[in-house]
Curated annotation (Swiss-Prot):
Residues 30-49 bind DNA. It comes from Salmonella gallinarum (strain 287/91 / NCTC 13346). The keyword Ion transport does not apply. Residues 176-210 have a biased composition (Low complexity). Residues 133-334 are periplasmic. The keyword rRNA-binding does not apply. This is Cytoskeleton protein RodZ. The helix-turn-helix (HTH) motif in the cytoplasmic domain of the N-terminus is involved in the formation of spirals to maintain the rigid rod shape. As this protein is anchored in the cytoplasmic membrane, the HTH motif may contribute to protein-protein interactions to form the RodZ helix, which is localized beneath the cytoplasmic membrane. The C-terminal domain may be critical for determination of the rod shape by probably interacting with enzymes required for synthesis of the peptidoglycan layer, including PBPs in the periplasm. It is a single-pass type II membrane protein. Cytoskeletal protein that is involved in cell-shape control through regulation of the length of the long axis. The chain crosses the membrane at residues 112-132.
């Protein structure tokens, strides 16, 4: 009878109550049990009060209860039926749903972040392309404007240069007139000589008549010869006048390795050159310094000023139209 009553009393007690009673009989405190089982005091208290911690899985809680039972010498076989009936260990089943919803929110946030990143990237690429296109268009417009200005300058030079042949023709006509009239004074001398010669016969008279004509022909030939010999003597003077500007210390010498457009003006605003220069061309200019240069392709030209090369590397690196001014440097006294 006593054994059955004890068994019924044990069944009436819960798992936590039995473990607490066993611990008190052994004289152990909750702190001592927690230290031996390597648990928190709050976990031991929850087990004795038949509470299931929300942050603890049921599998771990069952293992803690078995370890607690072995520590206080309570048979595990007596506790297992009580655990099945009481089912105090309620695990939170919402956790998987929470993790799923959390992952969904995180995925949505990552999607928004990726979309924003792509948007910023497209904006940066678009702005870069627009900036490049504006610079390219401005460069092309500048080259077109320079070409139009050079064409207008060439047309103006052609219009002003049409009067040059007329002036040279007048000069040549004035030069040739004295040469043609020069032989005239020689005829009176020959005629006086002819009148002083006596004419004894008709044949002699005919001979004397023919002689002045021959003398005139000879005189014209001899007078024309000095004129012909004097004419080439003027050529070296004109050639020397053309070559004279090259000796100017402020001369500007340019050699072209490729086709290049350029414009050169001096200090007075006079346009010394404006137009296109072809490959392997040379250009010698003289004027009043300083010179203002505008070069479409700096890499295609080599410039020497006052016998020194001009550095165009900064324009070649940036591939821009070169605009520079060459100032006159004082020449040393000799």
């Amino acid at each position: 009878m006593n054994t059955e009553a004890t068994h019924d009393q044990n069944e009436a007690q819960t798992t936590g109550v039995r473990l607490r009673n066993a611990r008190e009989q052994l004289g152990l405190s909750q702190q001592a049990v927690a230290e031996r089982l390597c648990l928190k005091v709050s976990t031991v208290r929850d087990i004795e009060e038949d509470k299931a911690p929300s942050d603890l899985a049921s599998t771990f809680l069952r293992g803690y209860i078995r370890s607690y039972a072995r520590l206080v010498h309570v048979p595990e076989e007596e506790l297992l039926p009580g655990l099945e009936k009481q089912a105090p260990l309620r695990a939170a089943k919402v956790a998987p749903m929470q993790s799923f919803s959390l992952g969904k929110r995180r995925k949505k946030r990552d999607g928004w972040l990726m979309s924003f990143t792509w948007l910023v990237l497209f904006v940066v690429v678009g702005l870069t392309g627009a900036w490049w296109w504006q610079n390219h268009k401005a460069h092309q417009e500048e080259i077109t404007t320079m070409a139009d200005q050079s064409t207008a300058g060439l047309n103006a030079d052609k219009d002003s240069g049409q009067s040059v042949p007329l002036d040279t023709g007048a000069v040549t006509s004035q030069d040739t007139t004295p040469a043609q009239t020069a032989p005239a004074p020689a005829t009176p001398v020959d005629s006086t000589a002819a009148t002083q010669t006596p004419a004894p016969t008709a044949a002699a008279t005919q001979n004397t008549v023919v002689a002045p004509s021959q003398a005139n022909v000879d005189t014209a030939a001899t007078s024309a010869a000095p004129a012909a010999t004097e004419t080439p003597s003027a050529l070296p003077t004109s050639q020397a006048g053309v070559a004279a500007p090259a000796a100017d210390p402020n001369a500007l010498v340019m050699n072209f390795t490729a086709d290049c457009w350029l414009e050169v003006t001096d200090a007075t605003g006079k346009r010394l050159f404006s137009g296109m220069q072809r490959k392997d061309g040379n250009l010698n200019l003289t004027g009043q310094a300083p010179y203002k240069l505008k070069i479409g392709a700096p890499a295609a030209v080599q410039i020497q000023y006052q016998g020194k090369p001009v550095d165009l590397s900064r324009f070649i690196r940036t591939n821009q139209v070169a605009r520079l001014t060459l100032n006159a440097e004082p020449t040393p006294a000799q």
